[in-house]
Structures are given as structure tokens and as C-alpha cells.
């Protein structure tokens, strides 16, 4: 199958049968480097009410922490602004991946393709994964190409030193943001649940527990045998929290969306040098569904917005500690909760289990269905 991307020819063909993990699709194209000043960012004023923009450095007083807790429970998704990470950190890591895709063949990329991406990074080809399959649903292949990165404390698969430096820098800087967000969440929880001791979850804060995926959603149409509803189907992350940086499509198409508890679908515009925070199912599980995980996905563009709909994102997953036990000191009222960790229930767990589980168990259950057939 052949499609046009940025006036260039893109050939999408099945990989050879001996490729590891799955067959995916071959993506032969080039992606020009991004320049922050040239991207069509949305103003902060365009954010819907369901997605607050929070200056995490200004959340410290009792009143600020109480409002923070109200804000993050609206949809399980919020923007962090004034976070201290220079824009060039994200632009450089986007461009490192874009250069990798643009200057290599699919055969060369397969050197970095493996079924242990979650441990020490690596490349995942276009349609090489299924977030719905990982969440135990009917698989739909993800219309995205990815590179996983575990961080500087792990030896990652990497094509070159420049690629390594850009990815390590992004990991290092976003870990600082994630840690600040997590500690602020702990402080806010203690206001609502005075017996809660943040030290209970202290083992969560570890840079080795964080990895990210560098993603490109190319302007590629589905093949004739496919029926797709989304570029990435609606899902709930299994993470503790997820940080996301996104750049907008050239044509203004807003692909990323979140669904609120009342079923309202809210588009998430790309705000310059800002990080989205998604509450994940692990944090919902540990707080007995008090903090709602964010149901989100990426829409496919309608035919009139197909041209110019390519977009990129950096999705950072912060994992919980290895032992996951719902806090005995967080006991929300029934009206304060929502069913926010269905994957945990689907694999036989409950928030009322005093024994809890292990992250290894949860992760391996997810990975079983993640790689597309």
C-alpha cells in the first residue's frame, strides 16, 4: 500500500516473517525536524474547563492543595505549566527520533526491535502494538510508530550517542517534574485523609520506575483490510501517573481527547512547552478509586482533515513500586469514587484486598496482549 505524507511517498508493507514479536508495517518516509516557533500551538486560553492548567510550583498552602485536589479529580487529566524544563529538551528528542526514522530503512530499524521494550527500550514499528489488546480487549493496531526509552540508569538499545543524549536528557528532566507532581499529590491526599502517610508510597519515587515512548502518528491511511475507529483507541493507562508532551498537527486537527466521568468527550489542544499529567490505574488502585484514572485516546482525522494531520508526542509512564497494596488509611466515601482501575479487576484484583499485588504481575498481564499479531 502506498500513501502520501508531506508530499512524499510512504510505503506500508508487511515485514518479513522472521521479525521478532510481530510483523507491523514498514514505514518508509522522512520527517523534517521540528522547530518550536513554526508549530501551530494553541493558546492556553483554549483549554476547556475540564482540563486545568496548574503551576505546580505554586501549590503549597492548604487552600492551594485543596484546590489542586479538586482540579485533578475533574477528569484525571491536567496540564502542568512553568515546570522548569526548557523547550529544547522536548524538541531535541522529537527530532532525534524523526531523524532516525528518516535516515534508516525498516530493516536497519529492526536491530532495535524486540519484545523487551518495557525493560530497556527499543523500536516498535507502525501498527506493531495494540493498546486495546494490552487492556484485554479486541485488538486494534495502534496507528503510531514508537521508540521506548527507560532512562540513563539502564542500558537502552540505541542507534547512536546523539540519540542517547537527547533521550536521556528528556528522561532526566521529566523525572524531576514527575517527582514534584507525585509529592504534591501525596500532600493533597493527606489533607483529605489525615491518617495517610506519604512514606507509605515512597518506594514509588525511583527514576528506574519511569520510561517514555517517543511517538509519531503519521499521515497514513488504513489499508483495505482494516477498519479503524481511532489512531489510538480509548484506554486507561496502567501507570501510576503518565506525563505527556504533544506537538500540534499542521492543519489544527486535535487528535488527543479525554472522556470525563459523565461520558463527555473533551479535545486536548497542544499547548506550547507544557506537560499533561494523566492519573493512571495504579494510582487509582492505591487510593481505592478516589483519584480517577483518565480515559483517553487519539482520534483518526476525518477525510477533510487528513492532509496535514501528522502529530507527535512524548508519553512518559511512571510506574508504581513493585509491591502494590491499596492504602489502609485512604477510605473514600462511595460518592467520591468511580470505577477507575478496570484492568486490575479484569485480572482478578480488588481495591479491598489487603494483600495487594505486584507491579510485575500487572505489567506482564498487560504485555501479553500488547504486541499486535
From Swiss-Prot:
Signal peptide as annotated in the record: none
InterPro entries, per the entry: DIOX_N, IPNS-like_FE2OG_OXY, IPNS-like_sf, Oxoglu/Fe-dep_dioxygenase_dom
Ranges where the Fe2OG dioxygenase domain occurs: 204-320
Binding site for 2-oxoglutarate: 311
Induction field: Up-regulated under phosphate limitation and by increasing partial pressure of CO(2).
Source domain of life: Eukaryota
Enzyme class: oxidoreductase
Binding site for Fe cation: 235, 237, 296
Enzyme Commission number(s) from the entry: 1.14.11.-
Cofactor binding annotation: Binds 1 Fe(2+) ion per subunit.
Keyword tags: Dioxygenase, Iron, Metal-binding, Oxidoreductase
Catalyzed chemical reaction(s): N-(7'-carboxy-7'-demethylgeranyl)-L-glutamate + 2-oxoglutarate + O2 = isodomoate A + succinate + CO2 + H2O; N-geranyl-L-glutamate + 2-oxoglutarate + O2 = dainate A + succinate + CO2 + H2O
GO molecular function, one term: metal ion binding
Cofactor list: Fe(2+)
Gene Ontology BP terms: cellular response to carbon dioxide; cellular response to phosphate starvation
Pathway stated in the Swiss-Prot or TrEMBL entry: Secondary metabolite biosynthesis
Family listed: Belongs to the iron/ascorbate-dependent oxidoreductase family.
Function in brief: Iron/ascorbate-dependent oxidoreductase: part of the gene cluster that mediates the biosynthesis of domoic acid (DA) and derivatives, natural products with neurochemical activity acting as ionotropic glutamate receptor (iGluR) agonists, thus being neurotoxins causing amnesic shellfish poisoning (ASP). Catalyzes the conversion of 7'-N-carboxy-L-geranyl-L-glutamic acid (cNGG) to isodomoic acid-A. Also mediates the conversion of N-geranyl-L-glutamic acid (L-NGG) to dainic acid A.
PANTHER family attached to this UniProt entry: FI07970P-RELATED, OXIDOREDUCTASE, 2OG-FE II OXYGENASE FAMILY PROTEIN
Protein name as it appears in the record: Alpha-ketoglutarate dependent kainoid synthase
Species annotation: Pseudo-nitzschia multiseries
Amino acid at each position: 500500500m502506498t500513501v502520501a505524507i508531506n508530499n512524499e511517498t510512504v510505503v506500508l508493507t508487511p515485514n518479513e516473517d522472521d521479525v521478532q514479536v510481530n510483523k507491523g508495517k514498514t514505514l518508509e518516509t522522512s520527517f523534517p525536524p521540528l522547530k518550536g516557533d513554526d508549530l501551530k500551538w494553541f493558546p492556553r486560553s483554549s483549554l476547556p474547563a475540564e482540563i486545568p492548567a496548574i503551576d505546580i510550583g505554586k501549590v503549597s498552602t492548604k487552600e492551594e492543595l485543596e484546590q489542586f485536589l479538586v482540579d485533578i479529580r475533574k477528569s484525571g487529566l491536567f496540564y502542568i505549566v512553568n515546570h522548569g524544563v526548557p523547550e529544547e529538551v522536548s524538541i531535541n528528542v522529537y527530532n532525534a527520533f524523526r531523524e532516525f526514522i528518516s535516515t534508516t530503512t525498516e530493516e536497519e530499524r529492526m536491530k532495535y526491535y524486540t519484545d523487551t521494550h518495557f525493560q530497556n527500550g527499543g523500536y516498535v514499528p507502525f501498527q506493531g502494538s495494540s493498546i486495546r489488546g494490552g487492556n484485554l480487549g479486541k485488538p486494534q493496531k495502534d496507528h503510531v510508530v514508537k521508540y521506548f526509552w527507560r532512562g540513563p540508569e539502564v542500558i537502552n538499545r540505541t542507534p547512536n550517542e546523539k540519540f542517547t543524549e537527547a533521550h536521556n536528557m528528556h528522561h532526566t528532566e521529566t523525572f524531576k517534574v514527575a517527582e514534584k507532581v507525585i509529592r504534591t499529590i501525596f500532600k493533597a491526599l493527606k489533607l483529605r485523609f489525615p491518617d495517610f502517610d506519604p512514606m507509605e508510597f515512597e518506594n514509588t519515587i525511583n527514576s528506574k520506575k519511569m520510561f517514555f515512548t517517543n511517538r509519531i502518528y503519521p499521515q497514513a491511511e488504513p489499508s483495505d483490510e482494516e477498519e479503524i475507529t481511532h489512531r489510538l483507541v480509548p484506554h486507561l493507562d496502567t501507570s501510576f501517573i503518565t506525563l505527556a508532551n504533544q506537538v500540534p498537527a499542521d492543519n489544527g486537527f486535535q487528535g488527543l481527547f479525554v472522556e470525563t466521568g459523565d461520558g463527555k468527550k473533551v479535545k486536548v489542544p497542544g499547548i506550547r512547552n507544557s506537560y499533561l499529567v494523566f492519573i493512571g490505574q495504579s494510582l487509582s488502585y492505591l487510593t481505592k478509586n478516589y483519584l480517577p484514572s483518565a480515559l483517553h485516546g487519539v482520534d483518526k482525522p476525518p477525510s477533510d482533515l487528513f492532509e496535514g494531520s501528522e502529530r507527535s508526542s512524548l508519553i512518559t509512564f511512571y510506574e508504581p513500586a513493585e509491591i502494590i497494596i491499596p492504602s489502609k488509611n485512604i477510605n473514600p466515601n462511595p460518592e467520591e469514587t468511580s470505577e477507575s482501575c478496570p484492568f486490575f479487576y479484569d485480572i482478578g484484583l480488588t481495591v479491598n484486598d489487603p494483600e495487594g499485588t505486584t507491579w510485575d504481575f500487572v505489567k506482564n498481564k498487560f504485555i501479553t496482549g500488547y504486541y499486535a499479531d
